[in-house]
UniProtKB/Swiss-Prot annotation:
InterPro entries: CbiN. It comes from Archaeoglobus fulgidus (strain ATCC 49558 / DSM 4304 / JCM 9628 / NBRC 100126 / VC-16). Pathway: Cofactor biosynthesis; adenosylcobalamin biosynthesis. This is Cobalt transport protein CbiN. Forms an energy-coupling factor (ECF) transporter complex composed of an ATP-binding protein (A component, CbiO), a transmembrane protein (T component, CbiQ) and 2 possible substrate-capture proteins (S components, CbiM and CbiN) of unknown stoichimetry. GO terms for cellular component: plasma membrane. The chain crosses the membrane at residues 4-24, 58-78. It is a multi-pass membrane protein. It is found in: Cell membrane. HAMAP family: CbiN (MF_00330).
Length: 87
């Protein structure tokens, strides 16, 4: 019951937070660099630049989903090993 309540509180909090608060660290760092040194030239350019923000968001979500699947698989695998040893 406590886990469900905590999850509901977390979901309500996430729904109330604005998009600006979820901005990426690289965007915030870029703003700070431009303020401190406006003539700064980046030494690296991306290999692939997504054509739109929606595609960039989709690729980020896909990356997060794949990472979550891998972590979930190994957590389940080791939990299964633990239960098999105790049986």
């Amino acid at each position: 019951m406590k886990k469900l309540l905590l999850l509901l509180i977390l979901l309500i909090f996430a729904a109330k937070v604005t998009a600006e608060e979820w901005a990426g660290a690289d965007e915030k760092a870029e703003e700070v660099i431009k303020e401190l040194k406006p003539d700064y030239e980046p030494w690296f350019s991306p290999i692939f630049e997504p054509p739109s923000g929606e595609i960039e968001s989709m690729l980020f979500s896909l990356q997060a989903a794949i990472g979550s699947l891998i972590i979930g698989y190994f957590l389940g695998y080791y939990r299964g090993l633990k239960h098999a040893r105790n049986a």
